[in-house]
From Swiss-Prot:
Intrachain S-S bonds: none
GO molecular function, one term: structural constituent of ribosome
Organism name: Pyrobaculum aerophilum (strain ATCC 51768 / DSM 7523 / JCM 9630 / CIP 104966 / NBRC 100827 / IM2)
Stated name of the protein: Small ribosomal subunit protein eS1
GO CC term, one of those recorded: ribosome
Gene name of the encoded protein: rps3ae
Keyword annotations from UniProtKB, A to Z: Ribonucleoprotein, Ribosomal protein
Amino acid sequence: MAEKQKAVAKQEKVAISKRDPWALKKWFSVYAPSYLGGVFLAEVPANEAQKLLMRTLEVSLYDITKDISHLPIKLKFQIHRVEGLKALTRFKGLELTRDYIRSLVRKGTSKVTAITEVKTKDGMVMRIAVLGITTHRIGTAQKSAMRKKMIETLVKKAAELDSGQFLKEILEGTLAADLFIVAKKIAPMRKVEIAKIKVLKYPPEEEQIVVKEAVAEVTSA
C-alpha cells in the first residue's frame, strides 16, 4: 500500500512539473562567506538542494559593500553547502572589468603585470594577477624588479594567513595597498590593483565538507 501511494505521489509530481516546471521549484537564499559578513547575495531556484551544489554565482563587490568604487570588481562564488533553504558559498574568483582596466592605462605611463600562484596557510592555492600603473614610463629593468618584489610580497603574505584572512585583505584593499608601497620604492606609482584571481585548489577541510554534503544528498534522495 505504501509503495502504491509513493508511486501515485510521484506521478502527480511528474504531471505538475509537465504543466508548470516552476511549480516544484524552491527558492534558496544564497549567502557570502563568513569573512565577508555572510551577507545575502541572491535567491536562486532549484528542485532540490543537491542541484545547487557547485553552482556558481557572479556578483559585484559593490553588491556586498555598497561602496560605489567597488563596482568594477566582479566576484565569483560557488555554492558548497546547503542548510534548509540557505545556500552557503565559497570564493571562486575575482576579475576587474575590462573597461576599468582600460581607464587606468594612460598615455605616458607603464603597465606592470605580475602573475603567480600562492598557497595560504590552510592550503588554498590561487593564481593571482596584479596590475601596477606607474606615473610615467619606466624601463624593462625597473619592470622586472617591481614584478619580482610584488610576487615575493604575494607569496609571503599568503603563507602567513589562512584563506579567509587572505581573501579579506584582498577584498578590503589592504593587500593592494601593501603592494603599492613595495612598488613605489622602485618607481612612482599611480595605481596597484589585484586584477584577477582564480582558485586552483581549496583547503583540504573545505573539500571534505563539500564531499560530505554531496554524499548526504545522494543518501537522502
